[in-house]
A protein has these predicted regions:
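Non-heme Fe(II)-dependent double-stranded beta-helix
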Residues: 1-60
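Histidine-centered active-site/metal-ligand motif
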Residues: 2, 50, 91, 140, ...
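Active-site rim elements
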Residues: 5-10, 117-127, 146-148
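Catalytic core of non-heme Fe(II) oxygenases with the double-stranded beta-helix
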Residues: 19, 43-122, 126-127
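A structural signal for short, well-ordered beta-strand segments
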Residues: 34-36, 70-72, 159-163
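Short, catalytically relevant binding-site loops at active-site mouths
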Residues: 38, 76, 91-93, 144-145, ...
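Non-heme Fe(II)/2-oxoglutarate
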Residues: 97-101, 133-138, 142-168
């Protein structure tokens, strides 16, 4: 999208999007992926528990977990419209064992089994960031996350910039 849309191109290069990741990694970053994640009212899909870096490592051959996601809410995100759920601190464990699921969602995903999720949640709990349109969150590529289906009457559309250290 950032290659075809001037507004998305400006967003992808905006200092507020890029500088936190540059500061964290201590070097310039590049755009690994630019995604628009639309969870339509009443029928937005579920995304199973996973780590983005697991997919990037297995499918894209990204050598190290020096990557972050910047998520911008284009709609209000509330407890009803399928918000992201994070397991705090799970990124500190590095890449976890995962199984390749090619059928549940429209995108093949390396998913984490339920027993592992139970143990992680017992240790770190669960959080589901919510906020008005325009809110921004950053999360590490190894942070375990998922989202439920959107059965509410409200869309939940977000833009994701996946930024990676240039040395990676």
């Amino acid at each position: 999208a950032h290659l075809y849309s001037k507004p998305f191109a400006k967003l992808a290069r905006h200092p507020r999007m890029v500088e936190p990741t540059t500061q964290l990694f201590g070097e310039d970053v590049y755009m690994h992926q630019f995604k628009i994640n639309g969870k339509a009212a009443f029928d937005g899909d579920v995304w199973q528990w996973h780590q983005d870096y697991g997919t990037w490592r297995n499918d894209d051959q990204m050598p190290e977990a020096r990557a972050m996601n910047v998520a911008i809410f284009l709609d209000e995100v509330n407890e009803f419209n399928g918000p992201l759920m994070f397991i705090p601190g799970s990124h500190k464990l590095g890449v976890l064992d995962a199984e390749h699921d090619v059928s549940t969602t429209s995108y093949p995903l390396w998913t984490i089994n339920h027993d592992t999720i139970r143990r992680l949640v017992e240790r770190g709990g669960l959080v589901a960031p919510k906020g008005p349109a325009g809110s921004m969150i950053l999360f590490h590529g190894c942070l375990v996350h998922a989202s439920t289906a959107n059965l509410s009457p409200w869309n939940r559309v977000s833009v994701y910039l996946s930024l990676c250290a240039v040395s990676n």
